[in-house]
């Protein structure tokens, strides 16, 4: 998954998803201020960030919103139901995207193979700069920094290293349970 970095951090009473704004086509930067992190669900009670092919990501985001309408306040169930569809539907199986989603209780990654994963250490990252952001965020979890500070610093480090990630960040925060 090229051309983006998305990170989620859950620490203390906050959960954050942050993403950069760069859209690349091959080796060309097409846009620097894309919004790959957004609030979804009833009242914006879920935050989601996506990496991968833009049209594919929007398709999955729409499908997740439909599942959240079907299973309100049940993010895990909505994601599992979406993953089932993703694995069994011929059209959806061809989509090349990943998503990180979070609500007040849980953070999850939805992969292109239909997996639904919860982070072991409260941190997950996807995209071309995901490994850099993940390492940075994990290193910062034992500091006094809050979830948003950790996410921003992790994104800054990823943008300094990954050529497909810029420093035009969108950050969304929720109060955690």
From Swiss-Prot:
Alphabetically sorted, this entry's keywords are: Allosteric enzyme, Cytoplasm, Hydrolase, Metal-binding, Protease, Sodium, Threonine protease
Question: What regulates this protein's activity?
Answer: Allosterically activated by HslU binding.
Q: Where in the cell is it found?
A: Cytoplasm
Q: InterPro entries from the entry?
A: ATP-dep_Prtase_HsIV_su, Ntn_hydrolases_N, Proteasome_sua/b, Proteasome_suB-type
Keyword Protease assigned: yes
Q: Give the EC class as a word.
A: hydrolase
- For this UniProt entry, what's an example GO CC term? HslUV protease complex
Q: Where along the chain is the active site annotated?
A: 4
Cite the Pfam families for this sequence: Proteasome
Catalytic activity, per the record?
A: ATP-dependent cleavage of peptide bonds with broad specificity
Q: Which PROSITE patterns match?
A: PROTEASOME_BETA_2
In the record, biological process GO terms are: proteolysis involved in protein catabolic process
Residue positions annotated to bind Na(+) are: 159, 162, 165
Statement: the UniProt record of this protein carries the keyword Metal-binding: yes
Similarity annotation: Belongs to the peptidase T1B family. HslV subfamily.
Q: Give the multimer and partner information.
A: A double ring-shaped homohexamer of HslV is capped on each side by a ring-shaped HslU homohexamer. The assembly of the HslU/HslV complex is dependent on binding of ATP.
**What is this protein's function per UniProt?**
Protease subunit of a proteasome-like degradation complex believed to be a general protein degrading machinery.
Record-given protein name: ATP-dependent protease subunit HslV
Q: Which organism is it from?
A: Mesorhizobium japonicum (strain LMG 29417 / CECT 9101 / MAFF 303099)
């Amino acid at each position: 998954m090229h051309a983006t970095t998305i990170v989620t951090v859950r620490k203390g009473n906050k959960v954050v998803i942050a993403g950069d704004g760069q859209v690349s086509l091959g080796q060309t930067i097409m846009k620097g201020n894309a919004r790959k992190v957004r609030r979804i669900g009833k009242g914006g009670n879920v935050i989601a960030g996506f990496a991968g092919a833009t049209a594919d990501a929007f398709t999955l985001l729409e499908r997740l919103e439909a599942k959240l309408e079907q299973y309100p306040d049940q993010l895990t169930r909505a994601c599992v139901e979406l993953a089932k569809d993703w694995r069994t539907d011929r059209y959806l199986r061809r989509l090349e995207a990943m998503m990180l989603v979070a609500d007040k209780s849980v953070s999850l990654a939805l992969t292109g193979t239909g997996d639904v994963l919860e982070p072991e250490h409260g941190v997950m990252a996807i995209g071309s700069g995901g490994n850099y952001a993940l390492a940075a965020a994990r290193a910062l979890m034992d500091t006094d920094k809050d979830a948003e500070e950790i996410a921003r610093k992790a994104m800054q480090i990823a943008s300094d290293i990954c050529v497909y990630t810029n420093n035009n960040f969108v950050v969304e925060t929720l109060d955690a349970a």
